[in-house]
Amino acid sequence: MTTKLNVLQVIPKLGYGGAETGCYDIAHFLSENDCGSFLATSGGELIKFIKKDKVRLIRLPVHSKNPILILFNTFILVIYIFLFKINIIHARSRAPAWSCYFASLITRRVFVTTFHGTYNFKSNIKKFYNSIMLRAKLTIAGSNFIFSHINENYWEYLSKEKKLRVIF
């Protein structure tokens, strides 16, 4: 017996940007291809267009960088992951990636990220904060430029066990 693929995507806001529309498109693609599609976000303009009979929407303050809210989001995500038998957790931004990372450790689910842009890293603390995007089993780089940026600036967070792929 095969297990149905259930994917949870987590993005701060579902607006009209590239990461957001990609998230929206993949959510509907998954549902149209017999996969469970779940989307956690704090809000955004595209929410009204989500086919709620096909994509389960989870409203959480995943846009917040507040450590207490990141921890809160972690525990709520853990509940959803177990309740809906989520197989893959896909984070598309740094703040929600921390919640997803901790939830993946607790639930032992596959953690994936998409690295969409270059991040400021003037301090070691900021670089550590950004490094969450490379702590996944698979990190997707949104372009060859981002792929090069990751290799040049975050090489110490890359390992042979974790994969880095480029899409464009």
Give residue ranges: language-model regions.
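Membrane-interface segments of envelope glycosyltransferases acting on lipid-linked substrates or membrane lipids
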Residues: 1-168
